[in-house]
Amino acid sequence: MSDNPTPESTPEAETPEVEKPMEPQGKVFDEAYVQSLRQEAAAARVAKKDAVEAAEARVKAEYEAKLAERDTAYTELQNQLGQAWIELEKVYLSLDAKVPNDKVRAFVEILEGNDRDSIAESVKSRLELVGGFGNKTPSPAFDPSQGRGGKPPIPLNGDPILEAIKAAVGIKK
């Protein structure tokens, strides 16, 4: 093994490079063709963007319409609740003022006001106008044709009948 190579075993010429026939070569396109492809892609992107924006606008419009409808329904319910509260306050204040049960509805119809204080003032003024309820003590039921209420009957002759007539007429002795 010598340090010098022998010429018989090594070729003197360098190996020529071999072309690679198996590798595909890139295609070369014309600039106008590339521009048309780019324009088609841009048109497709713009069309998709427009379609998305139109769909979003349609959904937003539908949602806003439903939201407006619900707001209207909510406002109507709040108004009905307010009216029911006012009516209930009128009934409660009428009952607190000792209005008879059979006259409460008629009394409530003449009351005015939208809050507790104004309704209370209306109740006071209407009670004064009507003259109040329940202030008069009812007289006990009395039917003179039905006897004397458990007392012994008056004899038809003598002084007791004369005294009863004098008492009924108001004659004093």
Curated annotation (Swiss-Prot):
Keywords: Coiled coil, Viral capsid assembly, Viral release from host cell. Residues 1-13 have a biased composition (Low complexity). Residues 36-84 form a coiled coil. The keyword Plastid does not apply. The keyword Nucleotidyltransferase does not apply. Residues 1-27, 134-158 are annotated as: Disordered. Disulfide bonds: none annotated. Belongs to the L5likevirus scaffolding protein family. Scaffolding protein involved in the icosahedric procapsid assembly. Coassembles with the capsid proteins to form the procapsid, in which the scaffolding protein is found within the external shell of icosahedrally arranged capsid protein subunits. This is Probable capsid assembly scaffolding protein. It comes from Mycobacterium phage L5. The lineage of its organism: Viruses, Duplodnaviria, Heunggongvirae, Uroviricota, Caudoviricetes. The gene is 16.
